[in-house]
Structures are given as structure tokens and as C-alpha cells.
């Protein structure tokens, strides 16, 4: 990928992040929930891909996919807990309020030996907080990345580009 292609990818991610962040967090959480459900449906084939590419035994591969599913479940709960504090101010007739603001584009680099779990740790939390993600998977785990991306694309509707693979 040359620098122009990279810049185009980053700009595309910025564009989708602005659209994504405007959704209320519980709605973002619902898409993450659907993603987790799709991972549940694809658990066996995704685990087979991990076994093939990362050379893990089947039980380890199944555990890694389960970790991704568990992160989806965790993020769904978080989507209803992104509240801030309201505090008294030293200034008369004023109050202080703590708010969550998305960062925008978040990067994630994953190694071949944990091709799905590490991505899920980063993506699920970043996404539910209103961010898009650019993912650089290991070149030794491309099929794992493609499997995750296909699962997301299946449930994400207009937000398929929330995950962009470098």
C-alpha cells in the first residue's frame, strides 16, 4: 500500500467515524450484539481458520473465538454505562459535567498467534465508544481477519467500513 492509498483509507475511516459517533451508544451496542451473535453462528469455521493459520489446537481456537464473543457481550453492557459525573462547581449557578467523546479513528495491530481475540478486545470497546478502527492483522493470519470482517459486514448495514483492514 502506498502513501496515497493509506491516506484514502484513513480518510474513509474518519468519514465513517463521524457518522458512527452520532448514533446513541445503546444503538452502537446493539450492532456489537448482532456481531457477537454472528460470531456465535460462525464459531466452528472461524476456529478452523485459526487452527489452520495460527497452528493452534482446536480447543484453543474455539476459546479464542469465544473470547471475541465475550468481548462483544461486555461491550454491549458498556454501551449503557457511558455516563459521566455531574459535580458542583466553585462558581455560583454552575455545575461541572463529565462527558465521553470518541477519539475518531483507532488503530489495531494483531499478531498471528492471537488473530481474533486481540482484535475483539480493541474493536468492541473502541466501537461502542463511538470510534472506527483500522486493523493491521498479521500477514500470517489474513483469512482470520477476512472471517471477522465478513461477520461484521453481515450485520453492520451502512457501517461495514467501521472496520477497515490495512
What are these regions (language model features)?
Residues 84-166:
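Rossmann-like NAD(P) dinucleotide-binding subdomain of oxidoreductase/dehydrogenase enzymes
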Residues 1-94, 138:
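N-terminal Rossmann-like NAD(P)+-binding subdomain of aldehyde/semialdehyde dehydrogenases
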